């Protein structure tokens, strides 16, 4: 019997292995101490890896963990050992792409903590109860911006404003030099 693609957890840890944003979708880790122990173990196992722009995959404690590092943030998606690695990798890619869009290409711990509500909304848009809903980063980011902060401008408008601000900064710098 085929089942829907599922995820056991999504973790966003800092460069020291501390929580930034985490969501667990199964009872594989029933207590907070079990969750923290799993996070520490995964972090230690992957810490020496050179995960860069591409996702890395590791079997860990009967689970498949797909991970990626961006600056001082470590992104992890965990699935069961029977889960398709490509699906887990696409969930990870969708999450990192959405975070990149929402944080306007400034993906670091400080910015992530300042926008933690939006990152948690991303997790809600990607997975519900362990079932994968969406893996396209731009779609996730647009949904988050649509029901994020009331009265906020749309993501497209934010991008235009950001481009104009950047152009103005470059023009000012060139005029002052």
Curated annotation (Swiss-Prot):
Signal peptide: none annotated. InterPro entries: AP_mu_sigma_su (IPR022775), Coatomer_zeta (IPR039652), Longin-like_dom_sf (IPR011012). It is a peripheral membrane protein. Its main location: cytoplasm. GO terms for biological process: intra-Golgi vesicle-mediated transport; intracellular protein transport; retrograde vesicle-mediated transport, Golgi to endoplasmic reticulum. The coatomer is a cytosolic protein complex that binds to dilysine motifs and reversibly associates with Golgi non-clathrin-coated vesicles, which further mediate biosynthetic protein transport from the ER, via the Golgi up to the trans Golgi network. Coatomer complex is required for budding from Golgi membranes, and is essential for the retrograde Golgi-to-ER transport of dilysine-tagged proteins. The zeta subunit may be involved in regulating the coat assembly and, hence, the rate of biosynthetic protein transport due to its association-dissociation properties with the coatomer complex. Belongs to the adaptor complexes small subunit family. This is Coatomer subunit zeta-1. It comes from Oryza sativa subsp. japonica (Rice). The lineage of its organism: Eukaryota, Viridiplantae, Streptophyta, Embryophyta, Tracheophyta.
């Amino acid at each position: 019997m085929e089942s829907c693609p599922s995820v056991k957890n999504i973790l966003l840890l800092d460069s020291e292995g501390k929580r930034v944003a985490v969501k667990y979708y199964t009872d594989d880790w029933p207590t907070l101490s079990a969750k923290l122990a799993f996070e520490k173990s995964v972090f230690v196992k992957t810490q020496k890896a050179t995960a860069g722009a591409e996702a890395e995959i590791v079997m860990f404690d009967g689970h498949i963990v797909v991970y990626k590092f961006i600056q001082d943030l470590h992104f992890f998606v965990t699935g069961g050992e029977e889960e398709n690695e490509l699906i887990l990798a696409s969930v990870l890619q969708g999450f990192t792409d959405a975070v990149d869009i929402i944080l306007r290409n400034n993906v670091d711990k400080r910015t992530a903590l300042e926008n933690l509500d939006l990152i948690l909304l991303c997790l809600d848009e990607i997975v519900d109860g362990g079932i994968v809903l969406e893996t396209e980063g731009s779609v996730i980011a647009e949904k988050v911006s649509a029901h994020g902060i009331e009265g906020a401008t749309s993501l497209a408008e934010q991008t235009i404003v950001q481009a104009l601000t950047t152009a103005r900064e470059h023009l000012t710098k060139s005029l002052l030099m």
